Curated annotation (Swiss-Prot), chain B:
The chain crosses the membrane at residues 12-32, 69-89, 98-118, 132-152, 165-185, 197-219. GO terms for molecular function: proton channel activity; proton-transporting ATP synthase activity, rotational mechanism. It comes from the Eukaryota. This is ATP synthase F(0) complex subunit a. It is a multi-pass membrane protein. One of its GO terms (biological process) is proton transmembrane transport. NCBIfam families: ATP_synt_6_or_A. One of its GO terms (cellular component) is proton-transporting ATP synthase complex. It comes from Oncorhynchus mykiss. The gene is mt-atp6.
Length: 245, 223
C-alpha cells in the first residue's frame, strides 16, 4: 500500500523516529483473524444503536428512549446550553442534504462495494473451478488410459499373429520357389532324355535307310522294275476292261 | 455563546494550545488502515478502490519521473477533500480557510516543480516561457507575461482559501439573515441556503481536486 511504503521508507532514513520495523514482529500478529460480521450493528433511524432501546425497554418501555431524546433536547434549549443561531439553520440544511444523499445513494454505493468484493472472490473461484475441472478431466483420462492398457494382451496377440502370418507366407513362398526350381531341373532332364531318344531314333532310321539303299543290288533293281512294268500292264488292262464295261 | 460572522475562521486555541493541529491530524482516523484480510468491509474496499482509481487517473499524463509524486499527490488530495468536507459540518473549523495553511502547501510544492524542471531539463523548462507559434514582434512581451504567469502559480493556495472562505461565509450570512425573518420570505432564503449547501459540497470536492490537478500539471511540464 502506498501509505505503508511511505512509512517504511521514512523509517529507513530517519532512525530517530519510532522504528516502525519493530512493530508487528511477534508471532501474535500471525494468528488467524476472526471472521468479520456479515452486517453492521443494527441502528434505529440510522444513527441511534438498537442497543440503547433494548437497554431502556425494561424500565421505560417502548417510548422511553424517545422521551429521553425529547427531554434532553428541551433541557438543552431551555437552559441555553445550546443557543439557536445561524449555524443551526446551516446545520439543518446540511443535515437534510446529507440524509437525502445517504438514503438515495447509500444502497447503490453499498452494492458497488459488495460487487468489488464479489468480483475478487469470483476471480479466485474461477481459477479454483478451472483447476478442479482440469483435474477431474485428468482423472477421467487416466482411467481411460488404464482401461486401454488392459487390452494390451490382445494387442500383443494380434501382433504375434501378424508376425506368424508373415513368416508363414514367407515360408510358403520359399517352398513354392523350391518346387519350381526342382520341376525345372526335372523338366530339363526329361527334355534331355527325349532329345536323346529322338536322336537315337533318327540315327537308327538313317542307318537302316542307308543299309537298305546300299543293299539294293543291280539285279534286284532290274527284277523290281520289270515286276513294276508287268504290274502296270496288268493294271492298265484291268482299267481298260473296267472302262469298256 | 453568540457567534459573530467570522468566528468560524479564527484559528481555534484552547488554553494556549493551537487546536488547528488537532483539526489537521484527527481526520486521519476516518480512513481505516487496510487490514491483512483478502476481503474487507465496505469502507476499506471503497477507500482502496477510490485511491487506486484516483492515482491511476492522476498519473496517466505523467511520465515515469512524475510517478515518484504519486503518494504525495494522492495523500494531498485525500487530505484536502477530508478537511473541506468536514468543514461543512456545523461548528467545525476548516483549516483550509487559513491562507497560511494553503500557501504552506502550495508554495513549496510549486517551487519543487520549478526547481526540478530547472535542474533536470533547464532548456525545456525555460522553453515553456515561450509558447509555440508566436509572432516574432510579440516575443519579448510574451516572455515577460509567461514569467509573471509562472510566478503567480502559487495562487493555487489562494484559490483554495478564497473558494472555501467565500462559501462558508455565504452559508453563514444566508443562515444569519434567515433567523429573524418572516416565514413567507424565509422560504426563499431557505431555498437559497439549500442551494448554497449543495454548491458548497461540490466546491469542497472540486477545489481539492483542482489543487492537485494543477499541481500535477505543473509537474508534467517540468519533470
Amino acid at each position: 500500500d502506498l501509505l505503508r511504503l511511505c512509512l517504511i521508507s521514512k523509517s529507513a532514513c530517519l532512525p530517530r523516529l519510532v522504528q516502525l520495523s519493530h512493530l508487528h514482529t511477534s508471532p501474535n500478529s500471525q494468528a488467524p483473524v476472526p471472521a468479520l460480521p456479515e452486517k453492521g450493528g443494527k441502528t434505529r433511524h440510522g444513527i441511534i444503536p438498537e442497543e440503547i432501546f433494548q437497554l431502556l425497554y425494561p424500565k421505560t418501555g417502548v417510548t422511553g428512549p424517545y422521551m429521553l431524546g425529547a427531554g434532553l433536547l428541551t433541557y438543552i434549549l431551555s437552559k441555553e446550553i445550546y443557543i439557536i443561531n445561524h449555524e443551526t439553520f446551516a446545520a439543518a440544511c446540511m443535515g437534510t442534504v446529507i440524509i437525502y444523499g445517504v438514503r438515495k445513494f447509500g444502497p447503490d454505493v453499498a452494492a458497488f462495494a459488495d460487487k468489488l468484493n464479489e468480483e475478487k472472490v469470483q476471480k479466485a473461484q474461477e481459477v479454483k473451478d478451472l483447476a478442479m475441472t482440469s483435474l477431474a478431466q485428468a482423472v477421467l483420462d487416466e482411467k481411460k488410459e488404464q482401461w486401454r492398457a488392459e487390452g494390451r494382451q490382445m494387442l500383443f496377440d494380434a501382433k504375434r499373429n501378424n508376425v506368424a502370418m508373415l513368416l508363414e507366407t514367407n515360408r510358403r513362398e520359399r517352398v513354392h520357389m523350391v518346387t519350381n526350381e526342382v520341376k525345372k531341373r526335372l523338366d530339363y532332364q526329361i527334355a534331355l532324355q527325349t532329345l536323346h531318344r529322338r536322336m537315337e531314333q533318327e540315327h537308327m532310321v538313317n542307318w537302316v535307310e542307308k543299309n537298305v539303299v546300299t543293299s539294293i543290288t543291280p539285279q534286284q533293281e532290274k527284277t523290281s522294275i520289270a515286276k513294276c512294268i508287268t504290274d502296270l500292264k496288268v493294271l492298265a488292262k484291268v482299267q481298260q476292261a473296267k472302262a469298256t464295261v | 455563546m453568540t457567534l459573530s460572522f467570522f468566528d468560524q475562521f479564527m484559528s481555534p486555541t484552547y488554553l494556549g494550545i493551537p487546536l488547528i493541529a488537532v483539526a489537521l491530524t484527527l481526520p486521519w482516523i476516518l480512513f481505516p488502515t487496510p487490514s491483512a484480510r483478502w476481503l474487507n468491509n465496505r469502507l476499506i474496499t471503497l477507500q482502496g478502490w477510490f485511491i487506486n482509481r484516483f492515482t491511476q487517473q492522476l498519473l496517466l499524463p505523467l511520465n515515469l519521473g512524475g510517478h515518484k509524486w504519486a503518494a504525495l499527490l494522492t495523500s494531498l488530495m485525500l487530505f484536502l477533500i477530508t478537511l473541506n468536507m468536514l468543514g461543512l459540518l456545523p461548528y467545525t473549523f476548516t483549516p483550509t480557510t487559513q491562507l497560511s495553511l494553503n500557501m504552506g502547501l502550495a508554495v513549496p510544492l510549486w517551487l519543487a516543480t520549478v526547481i526540478i524542471g530547472m535542474r533536470n531539463q533547464p532548456t525545456a523548462a525555460l522553453g515553456h516561457l515561450l509558447p509555440e507559434g508566436t509572432p516574432v514582434p510579440l516575443i519579448p512581451v510574451l516572455i515577460i507575461i509567461e514569467t509573471i504567469s509562472l510566478f503567480i502559480r502559487p495562487a493555487l493556495g489562494v484559490r483554495l482559501t478564497a473558494n472555501l472562505t467565500a462559501g462558508h461565509q455565504l452559508i453563514a450570512t444566508a443562515a444569519f439573515v434567515l433567523l429573524p425573518m418572516m416565514p413567507t420570505v424565509a422560504i426563499l432564503t431557505s431555498i437559497v441556503l439549500f442551494l448554497l449547501t449543495l454548491l458548497e459540497i461540490a466546491v469542497a470536492m472540486i477545489q481539492a481536486y483542482v489543487f492537485v490537478l494543477l499541481l500535477s500539471l505543473y509537474l508534467q511540464e517540468n519533470v
